[in-house]
Design a protein with these regions (language model features):
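Short, basic amphipathic alpha-helical segments that act as recognition/interaction helices
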Residues: 29-49
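Long, K/E/R/D-enriched contiguous segments that form extended
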Residues: 289, 358-360, 371-385, 392-398, ...
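Surface-exposed, Lys/Arg-rich phosphate-binding patches that contact polyanionic backbones
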Residues: 12-31, 35
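Positively charged, amphipathic and often flexible ligand-engagement surfaces
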Residues: 60-617
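Short Lys/Arg-rich basic patches
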Residues: 1-10, 19
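Rossmann-like NAD(P) dinucleotide-binding subdomain of oxidoreductase/dehydrogenase enzymes
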Residues: 730, 756-818
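Terminal low-complexity tails and localization/encapsulation signals of metabolic enzymes
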Residues: 528-529, 541, 545-548, 552-690, ...
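Short, positively charged interaction helices/loops
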Residues: 43-60, 65
Length: 818
């Protein structure tokens, strides 16, 4: 999407009013102007403004006046790319990382069913689960894979070992490294404990094989066998396991993948289509890493739409097959930081695929991905909905994840979007498949909270609350409920009412996981079915493209909280299996004394290190509110006249300062003078060494706990100055914004870490200082390593002579000042 810079001349009074108003909101003047324009345009488009009564005197606006070319202003371009938001979009952003204690109580109110409806839901869910459990004891490929997953669950060491193998083997190109991994993961498993535990001959055979090969690959540690025999068995063992795991992966792959090609998948789907099921096909593959990847995925989608469209044969978007697409497959830089490229390069590809789908009248769903891509995907969706060529067509679909705290507000937004664009959107509601990575990423980035719920039962409650919202807007939303949970299915069945009509809503399930459950749903009521439609999400791809999708499915199946896993576990009663999540949350709240407490074993990101030390806070670069605040801080920091010189105290004679100040330039733009620096003379260096020696005893005598408190205070000051410190790093060191955040966080981490090292059990009598320590900073980590060296030396009781890299003196000076 191209952009144009437009301007208007303002008097000083108006400029000051803008600045003061923006500061009240912790925003920039540029953001406020764009937001005002956005809001006013929205009012005009909704016929809410009388243009005959302008509040601005027209004679004050001279549209013919050219805006003079301004001098370079640091971070102005960053500020210009902060997007104004509507009320609904702003609400979505605000809910990004809402504490669970705030989010869950609201969900409970929305998800609670009337008592008679709750009883009917439980009764139906119990009946479905009872029949399903009996079926799970049967045979067939589905039962074989289910048995293997059940026996080697992710709660066992052996299950984790298999998971590691499944996740890693296809990433390793050479056999030697693959064998080394097998040796590590298989040889330590207690496979004997699983022998004979399953009723499945297949599972027991697999266990025998793993037991045998586990011994083979560990024989180099078995003293009772000769070295020669060890070598023979080891050489034969690892390739044997590699082949065995490869076969197991292929078996599971056939369980979860409809076909290696779209034509094969369409042929394989006919059997269940004849029973009333429909399909949504997904071309397997993960995010594009190169432009060639993106073009290959685009061609794959085009060919699939053509084949699916021909197979649909005019059945339409609700009755016929459809396709699901991943936006990350269409562009290698699909992220908020590359917004303009996404809009100018990815969007045309999305539009072309959607127009092709419209030509065949098949539904096209935009798949959900990681949380940081949600809001940019909403921008793409909105633009798509207002395309004139797609007007009046209801085949556009979007996937929303119930485990995200923003989910209810996203639903409010898409309902409004459908209303404004005068169409009916297909909305697939899923629980979410990236939970592990979302939690880990928030911890790594030091964000204030998680974008997802930490307890699965909260996600179940969210799903019900969001399902109610979708069903309440039948004119604008075609709900697609993707679930394998009998209670969730039953609740939706009752929420939607008994007067079902074609096109009201549909259920969805994953190929290889949900067919036994939905065999009770799809079909005529006279045949004992529920008479509701189900669409199967059907992955298409080769064995090599299966890996990441298979891992997500294994995580879903192998998790102890998964309905698919628990249905086969006869130690879990059916009543427990189909328990109402709302009642379960209420029971937990009674026991814990508060509604919505997070998982006790998942600390918030800032508490990642427990009581030992605090995790350094980061900035979420996909959060428009955080970006606006950062923009304001960066623009303010750029107005500071930064000057640095040797810091020697007041005792050094100023007459000896002979060096002239030099300008420090932005390496990316020499028109940007970041500040000035006066370098130290030889006399100043000698004086600094003398002072460091003289003050050494005083600093060493300071109690370690007090030294630690000074470092913690410095860390807290750095946290408060994140924006200004980032600004200097970007301008002086040429850092990108994300690298600058990481740099400041690493410096803060060093301070907290070394403070924690000496805060307790550090004795000055046993840990003597070295004396004055010289810390020389590298230019590529001018704050982090600079601060880390100093923090370690100071914590241990040494005085420090700190010398920054000659390219980056300003950031070092700022750090020392703090």
């Amino acid at each position: 999407m191209s952009s144009t810079t437009m301007g208007v001349r303002l008097d000083e009074e108006t400029r000051n009013r803008l600045k003061e108003a923006a500061q009240k909101l912790d925003r920039t003047s540029h953001w406020l102007i764009k937001q005002a324009i956005f809001d006013y345009l929205e009012q005009i488009e909704n016929d809410q403004v009388n243009l005959g009564h302008s509040t601005v005197a027209e004679q004050d606006i001279d549209e013919s006046t050219e805006i003079p070319t301004a001098h370079y202003q640091p971070f102005l371009e960053f500020a210009e790319h902060i997007h104004p938001q509507s009320v609904l979009r702003s609400a979505i952003t605000s809910a990004y990382r809402t504490p669970e204690t705030q989010a869950v109580p609201m969900l409970l109110q929305q998800a609670t069913l009337p008592e008679n409806e709750a009883q009917a839901t439980h009764k139906l869910a119990y009946s479905i689960a009872e029949k399903l459990r009996k079926q799970k004891n049967g045979v067939g490929r589905s039962g074989l894979v289910q048995g293997l997953l059940q026996e080697f669950s992710l709660s066992s060491q052996e299950g984790v070992a298999l998971m590691c193998l499944a996740e890693a083997l296809l990433r390793i190109p050479d056999k030697a490294t693959r064998d080394a991994l097998i040796r590590d993961k298989i040889s330590h498993g207690n496979w004997r404990s699983h022998l004979g535990q399953s009723q499945s001959m297949f599972v027991n055979a697999a266990t025998w094989g793993l037991l045998f090969t586990g011994k083979l690959v560990s024989t180099h540690n078995e003293e009772k066998l000769s070295n020669s025999l060890n070598r023979i068995l080891t050489k034969s063992g690892e390739p044997l396991v590699r082949k065995g795991v490869d076969m197991a992966m292929r078996l599971m792959g056939e369980q979860f993948v409809t076909g290696e090609t779209i034509s094969q998948a369409l042929a394989n789907a006919r059997k269940l289509e004849e029973k009333g099921f429909s399909y949504s096909y997904d071309m397997l593959g993960e995010a594009a890493l190169t432009e060639k990847d993106a073009q290959d995925y685009l061609v794959s989608y085009q060919q699939a739409i053509h084949a699916i469209g021909k197979a649909s044969n005019g059945r339409g978007i609700y009755e016929g097959p459809g396709i699901s697409i991943k936006l990350s497959a269409l562009h290698p830089r699909y992220s908020r930081s590359q917004y303009e490229r996404v809009m100018s390069e990815l969007y045309p590809r999305l539009l072309s695929l959607t127009l092709q789908a419209k030509q065949y009248d098949i539904g096209i769903n935009i798949d959900a991905e990681e949380a940081d891509r949600l809001e940019i995907s909403l921008d793409l969706l909105e633009r798509l909905c207002f395309e004139p060529e797609l007007a009046g067509w209801n085949g556009i679909g979007f996937v929303i994840q119930a485990y995200q705290k923003r989910c209810p507000l996203v639903i409010d937004y898409v309902i409004d979007l459908a209303r404004r664009s005068r169409r009916r959107l297909m909305i697939r509601l899923v629980k979410g498949a990236y939970w592990d990575s979302e939690v880990k990423r928030a911890q790594i980035d030091g964000l204030e909270d998680y974008p997802v719920y930490t307890r699965k039962v909260y996600t179940d409650v969210s799903y019900l609350a969001c399902a109610k919202k979708l069903l309440a807007s039948p004119n604008f939303i075609y709900p697609q409920f993707a679930t394998h949970n009998a209670h969730t299915l039953s609740a939706i069945y009752h929420l939607a009412g008994q007067n079902y009509y074609p096109g009201q809503y549909e259920f969805q399930c994953l190929h290889g996981m949900g067919e036994p459950l939905y065999a009770q749903v799809v079909g005529k009521i006279a045949d004992g079915k529920l008479g509701r439609p189900c669409r199967i999400y059907a992955p298409v791809g080769t064995h090599e493209t299966l890996l990441a999708y298979l891992v997500r499915r294994l995580l879903e199946n192998g998790a102890n909280t998964s309905f698919v896993n628990r249905i086969a576990d006869t130690t879990i009663s059916l009543d427990e299996l189909v328990a109402d999540p709302v009642k379960e949350v209420n029971r937990m709240a009674q026991a814990e004394g508060q509604v919505g407490l997070s998982h006790p074993k998942i600390p918030l990101p800032h508490k990642l290190y427990g009581d030992e030390r605090k995790n350094s806070p980061g900035i979420d670069m996909s959060n428009e509110h955080r970006l606006a605040s950062l923009s304001s801080a960066l623009l303010t920091s750029a107005t500071e006249n930064i000057h640095c010189e040797p810091l020697l105290g007041d005792t050094f004679s100023s007459s000896e300062k002979t060096q002239e100040p030099q300008s420090v330039l932005n390496p990316a733009n020499h028109a940007d003078i970041v500040g000035t620096v006066r370098e130290a003379t030889e006399a100043e260096a000698d004086f600094a060494l003398t002072i460091a020696q003289e003050k050494g005893e005083i600093w060493f005598a300071t109690p370690p706990a007090q030294r630690a408190s000074f470092l913690i205070r410095a860390a807290e000051l750095m946290e408060q100055q994140m924006g200004p410190l980032m600004g200097i790093l970007v301008r002086e060191a040429g850092k990108t914004y994300s690298n600058a955040i990481a740099e400041v966080r690493e410096a803060i981490d060093f301070l907290y870490y070394y403070a924690a090292q000496v805060a307790q059990d550090f004795d000055n009598n046993t840990h003597r200082p070295l004396g004055p320590v010289v810390c020389i900073s590298p230019w590529n980590f001018p704050l982090a390593i600079f601060s880390g060296q100093i923090a370690a030396a100071l914590a241990a009781g040494n005085t420090v002579l700190a010398k920054p890299a000659e390219q980056t003196p300003l950031i070092a000076s700022k750090a020392v000042a703090l």
